[in-house]
Amino acid sequence: MGEPKAGNLIIETRDVSKLYGSLKAVDRVSLRVRRGEIYGFLGLNGAGKTTTIRMLLGMIRPASGEVFVCGQSILPGRGGPWERVGYMVETPRAWPELTVEENLRAASALRRLKGDGAARRMIALLRLDEYTKVRARDLSQGNKQRLGLAKALIHHPDLLILDEPVNGLDPAGIVEIRELLRKSAVEDGATVFISSHNLGEVSRMAKRIGIIHRGALIREVDAEELEASLHRSLVLDVRDREGAASFLAREGYAVDRDAAGRLLLSAPEVCGKPEEINAILVRAGFPPGYVAVASEDLESWFLRTIGEDAC
């Protein structure tokens, strides 16, 4: 995976850190996100995701390092390329007493867009037609999410920053939003930066995923390569883990542990064929049915990556 060209970068942070007293909320994070890319920013609650976003948006000043958005240096109190940026917080804000239609007209006016065309387009795009006269306070959580996304998209931004964008949506709604974001990236050339703790959804939407843990960006992966790698690993749940690990290591297999302490085996010649591993262990004296073998799942991979135990 090649490095993005400097002129093609929409988000760039250079060794950015943020301190709250003695707590290092963000620790030397360097991000490079391309034009037209969907980038997933993944971490547990408190990992540093929201603090990073607030620095991207110029809401807070880094303790050290530099932030660039759309090629422009970002610092609080200075102007920024905000006419090119759309942002949706985890709990979208709206004027509660205004209807959906009035909220979108107001958002359009704040962006200095002429007429009602942008508001009508967003109502159709986010399937809010039935709710145009409903006050924002009376919407379901899912429709509040739709309204928040509509407000973020209303001015055709070059960069869309989303914090937990599918919270409160049903499965059908999640699929709709996923396809909408892909369309924004592929057809409109928008860059989409998704912050979330939900690896499953992020891996379905993003091209690349950055893992932040305890303030540090500890890994970046290609989502398709991650999915393929899971199918190249087998998880063995055996009673005698130490005995099985020792035997398989003697047989030349690289044996690791997943987040739950189960054996993790990367064996391209047998992956996808768990029955062969069962047969090998049975021949070695492990009783039949003694071993359960499956591909590693996303949750196990994530917890193993950040070094946390499964609970």
Where are these regions (language model features)?
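ABC-family P-loop ATPase nucleotide-binding domain
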Residues: 1-17, 308-311
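Short, flexible cytosolic linker that couples an ABC transmembrane/permease module to its adjacent nucleotide-binding
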Residues: 2-3, 121, 222-226
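ABC transporter nucleotide-binding domains
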Residues: 8-11, 18-194, 199-213, 217-219
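Structural motif detector for alpha-helix initiation sites
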Residues: 35, 100, 223, 295-298
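Generic structural signal for individual residues within well-ordered alpha-helical segments
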Residues: 104-105, 120-123, 175, 227, ...
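ABC transporter nucleotide-binding domain
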Residues: 178-268
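Short, charged/small-residue-rich alpha-helical element at the C-terminal edge
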Residues: 232-305, 311
